[in-house]
Design a protein with these regions (language model features):
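Catalytic cores of peptidoglycan-degrading enzymes
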Residues: 1-97
Length: 97
């Protein structure tokens, strides 16, 4: 999903985990991917900066990036995705945690 947000505002980890990727990815701009174990991963795209590095352990609510427009969209926003066993799933239940 794409969530409109103020440019430069914090992007926070949805759950505890380990950073798998903090780099540019075509179509997503600057991306942070967090592995939460049990096959669950979260992807945060369109960032202006990453605040974590590959291998870092993160806690739920920890700032991991800052909102930007690196995905090529005109408005600052966050691309947010959850993958379970490699398949995209509805991220909305995760947002209520």
């Amino acid at each position: 999903i794409v969530i409109a947000a103020r440019e430069g505002s914090d992007v926070r980890a949805i759950a505890d985990g380990r950073v798998l990727l903090a780099d540019w990815l075509q179509g997503y701009g600057l991306v942070v991917v967090v592995d939460h174990g049990r096959g669950d991963m979260s992807l945060y795209g369109y960032n202006q900066s990453a605040l974590v590095n590959v291998g870092d352990q993160v806690k739920a609510g920890q700032p991991i990036a800052q909102v930007g427009t690196s995905g090529g969209q005109g408005q600052p926003s966050l691309y947010f995705e959850i993958r379970r066993q490699g398949q995209a799933v509805n991220p909305l239940p995760w947002l209520g945690r």
